[in-house]
């Protein structure tokens, strides 16, 4: 076991103290079927010595029964937990694993590569800071590679590590790696991700995963784990204060506090705040936590605020700074991932739940549907399981939100079926209908007609319909 594991076994309090101040990175592994996602995670855990002896013994036993490789020890079984996954050698569920290095703590989400499990991937990626896109060196950039990359971009992941896996299968050929790197960079011009890094690896053999590879001395960069340890994610934090009230704490007549997790920004005792939707203002009297009162609190902290004035605040309300208010609207546009077998019904009433706030609402129109394999937009009058589309929403009570690209915590929501209480969709807000209408490009009648003429007579030019941009 590693030093951390030894410390965990001998002095739990010291282990917790050491790890308390480490920053946390959540990352997702995704790629085509059988690209080696589970094997990669198994290799990270194995080579960083984060596996206990009893777990090792169980995996060695299971390897004899389910082994999908030629090795005596199947690393993918460290992650593939479902019986059907082990029998088929694939990942179906979203599997989470936890480990830590001297620099940082990690939560890994291993997601399915199959298209029919797109909703599982969306679930796993929704809270991640970084994505590892695995590409099989034998096949290069595939359709599923594009699909997973697009979904990561859609969900606001700002850091990508493209791991070209199974380099051992192509004799560690540098030319193969360079071609895949060039192909992906060309494709990635369509993505809204600025930080993309590349590393050639062999998860099965351990090359460039935790330790540097002796077989790829031509690669000048860092192994995968070193990249994960050094990529800076703290710059992604939004500095506008947002606190969604989860409940009002009233243990006695002398105390009234508003509990929730700080979604973004920072708050201090004495700061002026505004409650939404009432618009009432007050000042922070105290910030109470499990460890006692604090002078300030920041994103990610679970706190209870007490105020100097008695103002009306209840569950589902939002506390902000008066000069940094979010958008408030009953009409908004959002990218919607449909997550159930029954198709989306336009104008049907669903429960719209954003944080702790719930209201009734419906999709009043579908702007377009996105082919996640090609990223092309097309017309649609419904969305079915695993499809993604841009939709116009109308809700009964105004939502207080930021654009998802600016704040993932306050720009996301889920849709719940009123009859079954099942979660049927997940949405990422693009903005209010009014705001987006102001920024939409306006084309003259001549431009629209000319565009239609070009598309009709010169289809090989692949000109896009400007009315749908």
From Swiss-Prot:
<dbReference type="InterPro" id="IPR044138">
    <property type="entry name" value="CysN_II"/>
</dbReference>
<comment type="similarity">
    <text>Belongs to the TRAFAC class translation factor GTPase superfamily. Classic translation factor GTPase family. CysN/NodQ subfamily.</text>
</comment>
<dbReference type="InterPro" id="IPR009000">
    <property type="entry name" value="Transl_B-barrel_sf"/>
</dbReference>
<comment type="subunit">
    <text>Heterodimer composed of CysD, the smaller subunit, and CysN.</text>
</comment>
<keyword id="KW-0067">ATP-binding</keyword>
<dbReference type="InterPro" id="IPR027417">
    <property type="entry name" value="P-loop_NTPase"/>
</dbReference>
<keyword id="KW-0342">GTP-binding</keyword>
<keyword id="KW-0548">Nucleotidyltransferase</keyword>
<dbReference type="InterPro" id="IPR009001">
    <property type="entry name" value="Transl_elong_EF1A/Init_IF2_C"/>
</dbReference>
<dbReference type="InterPro" id="IPR044139">
    <property type="entry name" value="CysN_NoDQ_III"/>
</dbReference>
<protein>
    <recommendedName>
        <fullName>Sulfate adenylyltransferase subunit 1</fullName>
        <ecNumber>2.7.7.4</ecNumber>
    </recommendedName>
</protein>
<feature type="region of interest" description="G3">
    <location>
        <begin position="110"/>
        <end position="113"/>
    </location>
</feature>
<dbReference type="InterPro" id="IPR054696">
    <property type="entry name" value="GTP-eEF1A_C"/>
</dbReference>
<dbReference type="InterPro" id="IPR005225">
    <property type="entry name" value="Small_GTP-bd"/>
</dbReference>
<dbReference type="InterPro" id="IPR050100">
    <property type="entry name" value="TRAFAC_GTPase_members"/>
</dbReference>
<dbReference type="GO" id="GO:0004781">
    <property type="term" value="F:sulfate adenylyltransferase (ATP) activity"/>
</dbReference>
<feature type="region of interest" description="G2">
    <location>
        <begin position="89"/>
        <end position="93"/>
    </location>
</feature>
<feature type="domain" description="tr-type G">
    <location>
        <begin position="22"/>
        <end position="224"/>
    </location>
</feature>
<dbReference type="GO" id="GO:0070814">
    <property type="term" value="P:hydrogen sulfide biosynthetic process"/>
</dbReference>
<comment type="pathway">
    <text>Sulfur metabolism; hydrogen sulfide biosynthesis; sulfite from sulfate: step 1/3.</text>
</comment>
<dbReference type="InterPro" id="IPR000795">
    <property type="entry name" value="T_Tr_GTP-bd_dom"/>
</dbReference>
<feature type="binding site">
    <location>
        <begin position="165"/>
        <end position="168"/>
    </location>
    <ligand>
        <name>GTP</name>
    </ligand>
</feature>
<dbReference type="GO" id="GO:0005524">
    <property type="term" value="F:ATP binding"/>
</dbReference>
<feature type="binding site">
    <location>
        <begin position="31"/>
        <end position="38"/>
    </location>
    <ligand>
        <name>GTP</name>
    </ligand>
</feature>
<dbReference type="GO" id="GO:0000103">
    <property type="term" value="P:sulfate assimilation"/>
</dbReference>
<feature type="region of interest" description="G4">
    <location>
        <begin position="165"/>
        <end position="168"/>
    </location>
</feature>
<dbReference type="InterPro" id="IPR041757">
    <property type="entry name" value="CysN_GTP-bd"/>
</dbReference>
<dbReference type="GO" id="GO:0005525">
    <property type="term" value="F:GTP binding"/>
</dbReference>
<feature type="region of interest" description="G5">
    <location>
        <begin position="202"/>
        <end position="204"/>
    </location>
</feature>
<feature type="region of interest" description="G1">
    <location>
        <begin position="31"/>
        <end position="38"/>
    </location>
</feature>
<dbReference type="GO" id="GO:0003924">
    <property type="term" value="F:GTPase activity"/>
</dbReference>
<comment type="function">
    <text>With CysD forms the ATP sulfurylase (ATPS) that catalyzes the adenylation of sulfate producing adenosine 5'-phosphosulfate (APS) and diphosphate, the first enzymatic step in sulfur assimilation pathway. APS synthesis involves the formation of a high-energy phosphoric-sulfuric acid anhydride bond driven by GTP hydrolysis by CysN coupled to ATP hydrolysis by CysD.</text>
</comment>
<keyword id="KW-0547">Nucleotide-binding</keyword>
<dbReference type="Pfam" id="PF22594">
    <property type="entry name" value="GTP-eEF1A_C"/>
</dbReference>
<keyword id="KW-0808">Transferase</keyword>
<dbReference type="InterPro" id="IPR031157">
    <property type="entry name" value="G_TR_CS"/>
</dbReference>
<dbReference type="Pfam" id="PF00009">
    <property type="entry name" value="GTP_EFTU"/>
</dbReference>
<feature type="binding site">
    <location>
        <begin position="110"/>
        <end position="114"/>
    </location>
    <ligand>
        <name>GTP</name>
    </ligand>
</feature>
<dbReference type="InterPro" id="IPR011779">
    <property type="entry name" value="SO4_adenylTrfase_lsu"/>
</dbReference>
């Amino acid at each position: 076991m590693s030093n951390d594991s030894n410390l965990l076994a001998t002095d739990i309090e010291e282990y917790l103290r050491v790890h308390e101040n480490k920053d946390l990175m959540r990352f997702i592994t995704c790629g085509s079927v059988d690209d080696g996602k589970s094997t990669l995670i198994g290799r990270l855990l194995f080579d960083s010595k984060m596996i206990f002896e009893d777990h090792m013994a169980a995996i060695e036993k299971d390897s004899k029964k389910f082994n999908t490789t030629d090795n005596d020890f199947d690393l993918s079984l460290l992650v593939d937990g479902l019986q059907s996954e082990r029998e088929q050698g694939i990942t179906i569920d979203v599997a989470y694993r936890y480990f830590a290095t001297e620099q940082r703590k990690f939560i890994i989400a291993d997601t399915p590569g199959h298209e029919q499990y797109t909703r599982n991937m969306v679930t796993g990626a929704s809270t991640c800071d970084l994505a590892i896109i695995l590409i099989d060196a034998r096949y290069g950039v595939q359709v599923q590679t594009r699909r997973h990359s697009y979904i990561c971009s859609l969900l606001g992941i700002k850091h990508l590590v493209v791991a070209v896996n199974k380099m051992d299968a192509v004799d560690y050929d540098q030319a193969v790696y360079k071609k895949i790197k060039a192909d992906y960079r060309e494709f990635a011009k369509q993505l809204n991700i600025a930080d993309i890094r590349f590393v050639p690896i062999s998860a099965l053999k351990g090359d460039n995963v935790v330790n540097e590879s002796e077989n790829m001395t031509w690669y000048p960069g860092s192994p995968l784990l070193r990249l994960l340890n050094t990529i800076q994610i703290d710059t992604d934090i939004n500095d506008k204060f947002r606190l969604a009230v989860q409940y009002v704490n009233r243990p006695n007549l002398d105390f009234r506090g508003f509990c929730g997790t700080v979604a973004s920004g920072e708050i201090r005792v004495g700061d002026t705040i505004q409650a939404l939707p009432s618009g009432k203002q007050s000042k922070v009297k105290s910030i109470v936590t499990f460890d006692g009162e604090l002078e300030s609190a920041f994103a990610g902290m679970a706190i209870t605020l007490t105020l100097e004035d008695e103002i009306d605040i209840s569950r589902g309300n939002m506390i902000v700074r008066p000069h940094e208010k979010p958008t408030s609207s009953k009409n908004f546009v959002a990218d919607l991932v449909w997550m159930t077998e029954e198709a989306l019904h336009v104008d049907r009433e669903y429960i719209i739940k954003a944080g702790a706030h719930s209201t009734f609402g419906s999709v009043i129109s579908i702007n377009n549907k996105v082919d996640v394999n090609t990223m092309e937009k097309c017309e649609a009058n419904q969305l079915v399981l695993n499809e993604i589309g841009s939709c116009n929403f109308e809700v009964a009570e105004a939502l207080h939100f930021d654009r998802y690209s600016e704040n993932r915590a306050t720009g996301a929501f889920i849709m719940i079926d009123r009859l079954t209480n099942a979660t049927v969709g997940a949405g990422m807000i693009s903005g209010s209908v009014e705001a987006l209408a102001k920024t939409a490009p306006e084309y003259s009648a001549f431009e629209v007609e000319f565009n239609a003429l070009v598309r009709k007579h010169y289809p090989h030019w692949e000109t896009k319909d400007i009315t749908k941009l």
